[in-house]
Each structure stands twice: as C-alpha cells, then as structure tokens.
C-alpha cells in the first residue's frame, strides 16, 4: 500500500504537488488583501465582482463607470490567452517548463508593481494584478490530480463540503484526503491575506515585494526539478491542461 502511494506521488510533476499549490494560493491571498487594503478596496483575483459592479452601474445609468469594468475584465482575458498560448512554445525549447518561466515572470511583474507610487491611481495596480492573477489561475490547475484554484477560495469551500459528506456517508478515505487538501488551500489563502494586511500597515505599496519570498521558494523548487530529475519530462503536460 505504501509503495503504491509512493508510486502515485512519483507520477506527479513538481508543479503538480500540493505544497506548490499551497504556496501559490498564499500568494493569491496576499494579492487579494493587498489590492483591498492598499489599492482601492477591491479584489482583483477573479472577475465576478467586476461584472456585478458593472451591472450595478448599468442599472444606475452610469454608462462611463460601467464601461471601466471592461478594462480589468479584458486584462484578465488577456492573461488567460497569453498563458494558454505561450506554454507550447516555452516547453518546446526544453530548457525549463512553462510553469517555471511563468513564476519568474510573475516575480518580475510584481517587482515592477512595487515601484508604482502610493498616490498613483489604484486602477493601475488593480488591472496589473487582474492580469497576473489570471495567468496564475490558468497555469496552475491540478494538484495531486485534484482540480485546484490558486487565486480564490469559492470552489475549495464547495469541495470541502462535498467531500465531507462523501467521507461521513461512506468512509471514503480518498474523499477525506481531498477535503483536507482543500482545507489546506483555504488556510494558506487566509494566511497570505493576513500577512499582506499586516505588512501593508508598515510598508504601504512596497508590501507587494514581500510576495517575492513565496514566489522564490516555488521558482527554485521548479527550476531544480526542470534542470534535474524532470529534465527528460519537459514535454510532459501537467494534468488539467
């Protein structure tokens, strides 16, 4: 039984391991709190709120304000398109995987964001975070072959409830494992948001740079795998893609 579980774990790429996703969703929580506390009181990790706000403005007849929300939505769409288009070309070069290249790009992106002055229009950072959050969401899709989001918690909450019922009803150990995996993701998201909120009180707009620590941990783990034990698997497509 132990050998079977070990073999199953070995089948996973480094970018599909649960701890990688836990760190990445902590980054997602960090971004969410950062834009809410520091950049205009909005959440930029997903688009549902933007469409609700656009609908509210349309209902009030504020056409110009409504049209603004097409900007973050378009940035999110663009992030998805780019992160769908580039992996094939990056992986074909067989130097590093797309996942690794993306984390390096994300580090550079938020490093640049840290230079945006605190008195600049918050929409600059909002749209920029929309873009990078979209790319992160689309790049990291499954951990341990379980569909996972790394920028928001809605599906994780649903999956906790669903798998809890399956576990209690039939004693399904796989459902129990999935439940705890989703709980870990929620906890990591909250931890990232708490840290971001605390740091914003001291560092202001520069707080975004602290996310570099988490991203660096992921980047070097993925890079080591790409250059080492997974170098002959650079053309293997992660589950969910």
Regions found by a protein language model. Give the residues of each.
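Alpha-helical transmembrane segments of multi-pass membrane proteins
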Residues: 2-241
């Amino acid at each position: 039984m132990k050998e079977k579980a070990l073999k199953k774990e070995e089948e996973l790429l480094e970018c599909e391991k649960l701890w990688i996703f836990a760190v990445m969703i902590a980054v997602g929580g960090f971004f969410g709190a950062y834009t809410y506390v520091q950049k205009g009181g909005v959440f930029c990790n997903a688009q549902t709120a933007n469409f609700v706000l656009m609908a509210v403005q349309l209902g009030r007849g504020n056409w110009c304000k409504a049209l603004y929300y097409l900007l973050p939505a378009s940035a999110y769409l663009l992030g998805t398109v780019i992160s769908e288009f580039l992996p094939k070309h990056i992986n074909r070069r067989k130097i590093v995987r797309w996942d690794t290249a993306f984390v390096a790009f994300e580090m550079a992106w938020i490093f640049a964001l840290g230079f945006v002055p605190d008195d600049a229009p918050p929409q600059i950072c909002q749209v920029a975070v929309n873009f990078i959050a979209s790319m992160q969401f689309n790049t990291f899709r499954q951990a341990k072959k379980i569909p996972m989001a790394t920028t928001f918690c809605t599906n994780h909450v649903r999956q906790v409830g669903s798998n809890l019922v399956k576990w209690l009803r039939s004693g399904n150990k796989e459902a129990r494992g999935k439940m705890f995996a989703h709980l870990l993701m929620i906890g990591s998201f909250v931890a990232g948001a708490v840290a971001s909120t605390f740091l914003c009180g001291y560092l202001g707009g520069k707080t975004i740079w602290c996310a570099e620590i988490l991203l660096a941990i992921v980047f070097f783990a993925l890079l080591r795998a790409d250059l080492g034990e997974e170098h002959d698997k650079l053309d293997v497509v992660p589950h969910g893609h």
